[in-house]
């Protein structure tokens, strides 16, 4: 029987998950298909029901459902529990399990750059579903200080309840940092801009955007223009997908140059 896997989100058009997972599915001769699905909040319950009935065999979750989907699940992995964020779902022993592969994805993507962020200061822009994963990964890497800024300050305050060590700063305010991470969806559209003083802050600072499609957002373009070191979210995306693939298929897919180049759009 051919198994069905989906990535759900809203928006979802930008997602390259099907391209990557179907490449690995074909490479490892797995009888499965992987598709993307634009979802409305009202459809979550039906979707989980279809996993129970094994009409769907696994899900990846993206914006804005990483927290929203938790009440519909039976159990969370340790990573999903501490982050309160789910990006991978599967059925085991008649239970629907939520897991988080973003923590590992972000951590590995950082460790494989030449940027050493241990004992450094990081500023995170955003307070959505992926941010808790980034905070946990940064702590594992032994970052010294985490600042957080979000357009809606209430969301940032909510996050601080779980991570009291972070310091909230006002949106648009600039501070001294070594690394800045765009964890918002600002950049998915070509005209999207994050209004910060790039000229003042960019030189020799590390700019990381979790967005991987487009491969270079205005955030990264502006940073590069003024001497910043830039990295998009492609490797984070690949490493989180690698772990999700292993959860579902018990195969660790190879991440080689062909895999990486596959996602160049």
Curated annotation (Swiss-Prot):
Task: Give the pathway annotation.
Answer: Metabolic intermediate biosynthesis; chorismate biosynthesis; chorismate from D-erythrose 4-phosphate and phosphoenolpyruvate: step 4/7
Q: Any idea which UniProt keywords this protein has?
A: Amino-acid biosynthesis, Aromatic amino acid biosynthesis, NADP, Oxidoreductase
Keyword Amino-acid biosynthesis assigned to the entry: answer is: yes
Annotated Pfam families = Shikimate_DH, Shikimate_dh_N
List residues binding NADP(+).
78, 126-130, 150-155, 210, 233
The EC number on file is 1.1.1.25
InterPro entries listed in its UniProt record: Aminoacid_DH-like_N_sf (IPR046346), NAD(P)-bd_dom_sf (IPR036291), Shikimate_DH (IPR011342), Shikimate_DH-bd_N (IPR013708), Shikimate_DH_fam (IPR022893), Shikm_DH/Glu-tRNA_Rdtase (IPR006151)
Keyword Oxidoreductase assigned to the entry: answer is: yes
User: Which Gene Ontology CC terms are recorded?
Assistant: cytosol
Q: Which reaction does it catalyse?
A: shikimate + NADP(+) = 3-dehydroshikimate + NADPH + H(+)
Domain of life from the UniProt record: Bacteria
> Which positions are annotated as binding shikimate?
15-17, 62, 87, 102, 212
Task: Supply the HAMAP family for this chain.
Answer: Shikimate_DH_AroE
What do we know about how this protein assembles, alone or with others? Answer: Homodimer.
Q: Which family does it belong to?
A: Belongs to the shikimate dehydrogenase family.
What functional role does this protein have? Answer: Involved in the biosynthesis of the chorismate, which leads to the biosynthesis of aromatic amino acids. Catalyzes the reversible NADPH linked reduction of 3-dehydroshikimate (DHSA) to yield shikimate (SA).
What protein is this chain from?
Shikimate dehydrogenase (NADP(+))
UniProt lists the gene as aroE
